[in-house]
Amino acid sequence: MSSAQSRGGKTGGKVGGKVGAKRHKKTQKEHINGITKPAIRRLARRGGVKRISFPIYEETRNVLRTFLTNVIRDSVAYTEHAGRRTVTAMDVVYALKRQGRTLYGFNS
């Protein structure tokens, strides 16, 4: 008698952390929707905006996705060129500078 049977538990499960074939493919989530409506509203308020129409929220998410994709792509290029596998803050600073958006306060 196994320990699971003696405790009254179910039997027949995998032991040792091994996992069988997956039945369903894992779908990729839209993480950009994590940028919530209140977060976009707060950013707009900081920029001096008083009222925001509904389509602006989705458009803001699309613009943010494009901007971050470009910055991350350039940052990874700097990291790979240096022969590293970890993106540093300076890689991001150089990527932003390359795009004409100089960020101050991160000199090494």
From Swiss-Prot:
Query: Which SUPFAM superfamilies does the record cross-reference, listed alphabetically?
Result: Histone-fold (SSF47113)
Underlying gene = H4a
General function of this protein = Core component of nucleosome. Nucleosomes wrap and compact DNA into chromatin, limiting DNA accessibility to the cellular machineries which require DNA as a template. Histones thereby play a central role in transcription regulation, DNA repair, DNA replication and chromosomal stability. DNA accessibility is regulated via a complex set of post-translational modifications of histones, also called histone code, and nucleosome remodeling.
Q: Please tell me whether the keyword Protein biosynthesis is annotated for this protein.
A: no
Q: Where in the cell is it found?
A: Nucleus; Chromosome
Bias class Gly residues marks the residues at 9-19
Q: How does it assemble?
A: The nucleosome is a histone octamer containing two molecules each of H2A, H2B, H3 and H4 assembled in one H3-H4 heterotetramer and two H2A-H2B heterodimers. The octamer wraps approximately 147 bp of DNA.
GO cellular component terms attached to this protein's record: extracellular matrix; nucleosome; nucleus
Descriptive protein name: Histone H4
Organism of origin is Dictyostelium discoideum (Social amoeba)
GO biological process terms, semicolon-separated = chromatin remodeling; nucleosome assembly; response to mercury ion
> One MF term from GO for this chain?
structural constituent of chromatin
TM segment ranges:
none
The entry assigns this protein to a family as follows: Belongs to the histone H4 family.
